[in-house]
Amino acid sequence: MLGCNAFPGVQCGHIVDPADAFMFNQINAGNAVAFPFAKGFGWGAEINLRYMFERLFEVAPGGGYPPERVEPEQRNKKILDAVNEVTHRDMVTILKELDPALAKGAVSGSRFQELFFANCKDEKIAEAVRELLAK
C-alpha cells in the first residue's frame, strides 16, 4: 500500500473487511486497494473478499460517511489531492532522478523489457527507459 501511494495519481487504501472497503470508497475515493491476503484469509475468505468488493463498488465514491460529513470530507480530499500533486512526480522525472545504477538494475532484465516495451502505453516513459538502458 505504501509503495503504491508513492506514485503520482495513486491513492491506495488498506482494506481488511467490508466496512474498510465501504469507508475507503466513501471517504477517500481512492483508486487502488491493498488486501492483507496472508492475514485473516483462512476459512470463508472468499465470502469476506466478495463482501469487500461489493462494498467498494456499491455506490459512487466520495459520498462521505456518515453522509452528513460529506462536505468536510470532500474538502479534506481536495486538500490531500493538492498536496499529492505537488509531492508526487511523474515517472519520467522519477526515472531520471533515481540513482542510475539502481534504476537500470530494475529495468535491465530481458523479461521485463519484453513485457514492458510490448505493453507500455506512454512513449515518454518508454523513451526514458531506453535512455536509462543506453547508459
Segments (PLM) and residue ranges:
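Short Gly/Thr/Asp-enriched flexible loops that form oxyanion-binding sites at enzyme active sites
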Residues: M1-C12, V16-D20
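C-terminal binding/interaction regions
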Residues: F22-K135
